[in-house]
Amino acid sequence: MQKWYKYVGFGAILLSLASCFEKKHEVMVAPWGVIEDTIPTTDEFDLHDIQTSGELIMATVSGPQTYYEYHGKYLGTQFLICQRFADSLGVRLRVEVYRDSLELVKRQAEGEVDIVAWPTPGHIDADTAKNDLAKELQGWYHPGLIAAVQKEENDLLTVRKVSRRIFSPMLDAKGGVISHYDQFFMAYARDIRWDWRLLAAQCYQESTFDPRAVSFAGAKGLMQIMPGTADHLGVSRSKLYEPEANIQAAVKYIGQLQNTFKDIRDNYERTNFVLASYNGGAHHIRDAMNLAKRDAKNPHRWSDVAPYVLKLAQPQYYNDPIVKYGYMRGSETVDYVQRIRQRHAGYQGVKTKFMGFHSSKPRKADKRKNKYDLKD
């Protein structure tokens, strides 16, 4: 038995399908050029086996062309193409992310994956030893596919990301009313020792105070809680459109993030990191902190870390060995923190008759255990 691979040009990705077989050589002509083909006389795991197992395994690296997570939704041109291909086969797609192309080649050579995808300059290739699967892929592919997939992704990233009604950022400044939900902000902000107006500012950034808001990724309600996050928090998905339940869930999650960043002693700075993590994910923010620390910056100061959040969109940074969670669209996260802080500054002039709940000065923490400590 020997391992042989076929290369198929797709325009900006390298797709590789691998298996073990004995070969005979054949030249094939496809819309994207001449292909050197190898047809197996035996094949250890091919199209029929994949359809029987119900799973197509894709191995890739993190990156904007390959595969990344954005607000709970997985994107990347290669991933979306492979997802469509898996759908056409009637199977689910499982994605395995590795550090570099050498690891991908190793997994391919060992027959552990069905498709390997990684970016190559200016074109997409595919190599395969699974002849049936390769022919299925060739017959399924059409020249307009990449453009269609890229348009789909760009539409998701550029159109309004949250379907929502736009409400005023402040209902009645003179009357001390920011929103219809101020009573809930006041009640629950105390649990995380936040000024309630900061929670209101974050809510406006998330949903513009629309309790029926829903994002393209499926986040719901005032504070845009993902269904999976609701499960983690023990909140019924059916209650995510209920204002109080949604705010309560968000506060519980914020409390967990505060615990995650308890190594940041300054409360104001820690809150910046919590806000950034609520938007972009705590793992990515930790990656940016590690990059900042490596470059002799203060990893506990947001102004030092924010530039590295932006840099996680650049290959030389998201491929750095110190980075564990890969590519990130950091510009939105940096903007998210800035906008909330600016809106909160505007809200701080709001007076309310409920004077007991809105002090902007954090209360002194007691020594009891944080109710939102994560379990190991």
Where are these predicted regions, by residue range?
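Export/targeting segments at the very N-terminus of extracytoplasmic proteins
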Residues: 37-38, 158-209, 247, 262-264, ...
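Low-complexity, Gly/Ser/Thr/Pro-rich intrinsically disordered linker/tail segments
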Residues: 332-376
